[in-house]
């Protein structure tokens, strides 16, 4: 028997759109590009086929454009910053795809979306230069979001987590990190010879949670040295960003394909940054659109 989702759990706006994103089921493509910055949606849409835009929707930090690129139907959606927003976005995308809004029940045939986050990141290994494109084969969530869902351990790599917490001298008062993998088929399709691959930390903040120190000291001043030196079964941690773990983890729980690819705009280990990174991101966007 299909579950029924009451109005308190699934909030549908008067116009038939989902609560936060404000888009309707028919406006969502199977292929979805996720970007953090609402302004980047227009950059992605600038590559779409002429006169192919089906909808432009804006609600809070969430902007959506659906159109086609070389005949492929694609939605580009901005998420804002952080895994808390990702919890909203991925749940609402899944609801749009797999819940019948008229009956408030799960559809008999479930739809699997392709979710690709295009973002920016800070590199943690000196051999990955500024401007590189870096795919997160594994995402390490410092945020704790996945622990609120049943099935967390079944989709996570527990041995990796245990080794990481021991190596980082993990603060027991912090949420335990979770480690999840990107969809292998999607990674193989997009991460070709022009991209690096690695394991990415999704931090739940930009400053202290990524080892940055301004006026407040941090709990573990050696955290980034420990991150750089960590190795597990041939894997190393390559970069920081702030959304990918929740995208990958929730997609695994819901039956969607997901991955994150970022342009490296800061090199934490050599204390360098590139503020003129937009041309690199534009090239990354076009590359992903060709391969998704």
Language-model regions: role of each:
Residues 38-41, 87-90, 183-187, 243-248, ...:
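Short, hydrophobic/amphipathic alpha-helical packing segments
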Residues 122, 139, 201-208, 246, ...:
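Glycine-rich beta-alpha junction loops
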Residues 159-232:
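Active-site rim beta-loop-alpha module in soluble metabolic enzymes
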Residues 234-238:
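Short pre-catalytic strand/loop immediately N-terminal to key active-site residues, enriched for Gly-Thr
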Residues 267-292:
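His/Asp/Glu-rich mid-to-C-terminal helical/loop segments that flank catalytic regions of hydrolases
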């Amino acid at each position: 028997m299909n579950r029924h989702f009451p109005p308190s759990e699934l909030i549908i706006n008067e116009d038939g759109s989902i609560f936060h994103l404000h888009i309707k089921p028919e406006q969502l493509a199977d292929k979805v590009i996720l970007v953090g910055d609402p302004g980047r949606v227009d950059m992605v849409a600038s590559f779409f086929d002429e006169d192919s835009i089906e909808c432009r929707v804006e609600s809070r930090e969430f902007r959506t454009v659906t159109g086609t690129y070389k005949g492929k139907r694609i939605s580009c959606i901005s998420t804002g910053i952080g895994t808390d927003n990702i919890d909203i976005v991925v749940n609402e995308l899944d609801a749009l795809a797999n819940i019948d809004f008229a009956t408030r029940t799960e559809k008999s045939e479930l739809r699997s979306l392709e979710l690709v986050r295009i973002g920016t990141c800070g590199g943690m290994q000196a051999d990955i230069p500024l401007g590189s494109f870096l795919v997160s084969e594994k995402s390490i969530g410092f945020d704790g979001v996945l622990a609120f869902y049943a099935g967390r351990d079944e989709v996570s790599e527990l041995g990796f987590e245990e080794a990481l917490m021991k190596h980082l001298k993990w603060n027991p008062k912090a949420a335990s990190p979770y480690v999840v993998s990107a969809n292998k088929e999607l990674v193989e399709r997009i991460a070709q010879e022009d991209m690096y691959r690695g394991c990415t930390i999704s931090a739940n903040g930009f400053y202290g949670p990524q080892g940055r120190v301004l006026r407040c000291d941090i709990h573990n001043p050696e955290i980034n040295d420990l991150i750089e030196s960590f190795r597990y079964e041939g894997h190393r941690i390559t970069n920081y960003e702030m959304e990918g773990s929740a995208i990958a983890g929730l997609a695994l729980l819901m039956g969607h394909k997901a991955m994150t690819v970022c342009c490296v705009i800061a090199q934490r280990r050599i204390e360098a940054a590139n503020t003129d990174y937009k041309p690199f991101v534009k090239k990354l966007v076009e590359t992903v659109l060709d391969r998704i």
